[in-house]
């Protein structure tokens, strides 16, 4: 009888601890609490991440990452058509020969007359494959 009581008490303690550990990844998770009322333009975002209620946040949301790292993430409703279009556009790789949005193309020379090194934030879009011989 005492063994059954101990087992029941242990089960109760474990059941109470589970909600505290779920959704915890060792750090505080920022959750979006409400959606933006305005459409977010493509030109100000560099990417996005998804927020799921199953991870402890109150609402499902898409959090758009602003180009300026000092700005807060922008929350949007994943069911809105413009949000899905913006996500698709961000998922597309840049066209060959085009720079990613917000990347300034090296114009050849700087004001001092020396060749510039280009922007460190720009990614190369073309990659060459080594030939097999």
UniProtKB/Swiss-Prot annotation:
Expressed strongly in lung, spleen, thymus, peripheral and mesentric lymph nodes. Also expressed in the testis, kidney, liver, and heart. Residues 87-133 are annotated as: Disordered. It holds the Pfam family IL8. The keyword Ligase does not apply. GO terms for cellular component: external side of plasma membrane; extracellular space. Residues 104-122 have a biased composition (Basic residues). SMART domains: SCY (SM00199). GO terms for biological process: immune response; inflammatory response; leukocyte chemotaxis; negative regulation of myeloid cell differentiation. The keyword Secreted applies. Disulfide bonds join 31-57, 32-75, 103-122. Residues 98-133 are annotated as: C-terminal basic extension. Three genes code for Ccl21 in mouse. Ccl21b and Ccl21c produce identical proteins while the protein produced by Ccl21a differs at only one position. Ccl21b and Ccl21c have Leu-65 (6Ckine-Leu) while Ccl21a has 'Ser-65' (6Ckine-Ser). Binds to CCR7 and to CXCR3. Interacts with PDPN; relocalizes PDPN to the basolateral membrane. Interacts with GPR174. This is C-C motif chemokine 21b. The gene is Ccl21b.
